[in-house]
């Protein structure tokens, strides 16, 4: 019922009020009653909540971040488009689709959080391929109409490494577009804070 702290936190992060309101109306964002965390909800085709990510709204110290126990990564947080779309943008974290939507202002594509990525530490040599993200594979299985995947991972070593591997894994079947934030070391949520 009361999402005041989530509103204040996301507005402070530069997220557009209309984006926040739309997410709350859709039931994919709310404020937890106990600790006032922002709760990003992933739903299945029937509208049943299957995934939740908690993000602390207090801005001092290290922020609290955790997936809710029992969350199913096949149904990570996702912003739907206004109309049918054959485009999908993918992000590392739940706040990033909101931030990128705020910056772009377009609702012409699905915006899916992968619920994090795996990448080796910078400087370590690895020829091992990245496992395909569960959230992405499951989304594509449910949405055979998708033709384009826009990779919007962070512009840091891990994000670029993941982008390379995701592009390699899905090219040929999908049109791949790389759209990392222009600023080195940033994600889209960092860019909305700077506006």
Task: Show the residue positions of the predicted features.
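TOPRIM metal-binding catalytic domain and adjacent DNA-binding surface shared by DnaG-type primases
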Residues: 1-38, 46
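Surface-exposed charge patches
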Residues: 8, 98-99, 168
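Generic recognition of cysteine residues
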Residues: 23, 76-78, 152, 186
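Phosphate-handling DNA/RNA-contact segment within nucleic-acid enzymes
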Residues: 33-142
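TOPRIM fold recognition
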Residues: 86, 102-195
């Amino acid at each position: 019922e009361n999402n005041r702290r989530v509103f204040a936190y996301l507005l402070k992060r530069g997220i557009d009020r209309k984006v926040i309101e739309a997410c709350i109306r859709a039931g994919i964002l709310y404020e937890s009653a106990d600790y006032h965390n922002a709760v990003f909800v992933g739903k299945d085709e029937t509208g049943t909540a299957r995934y939740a990510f908690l993000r602390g709204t207090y801005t001092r110290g290290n922020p609290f971040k955790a997936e809710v126990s029992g969350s199913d990564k096949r149904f990570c947080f996702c912003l739907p488009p206004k109309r049918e779309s054959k485009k999908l943008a993918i992000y590392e974290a739940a706040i990033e689709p909101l931030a990128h939507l705020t910056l772009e202002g377009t609702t012409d594509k699905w915006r899916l959080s992968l619920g994090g990525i795996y990448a080796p530490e910078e400087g370590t040599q690895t020829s091992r391929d990245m496992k395909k993200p569960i959230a992405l594979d499951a989304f594509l299985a449910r949405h055979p109409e998708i033709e384009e995947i826009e990779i919007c991972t962070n512009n840091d070593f891990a994000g670029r490494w993941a982008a390379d591997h995701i592009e390699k894994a899905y090219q040929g079947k999908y049109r791949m577009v790389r759209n990392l934030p222009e600023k080195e070391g940033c994600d889209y949520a960092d860019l909305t804070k700077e506006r």
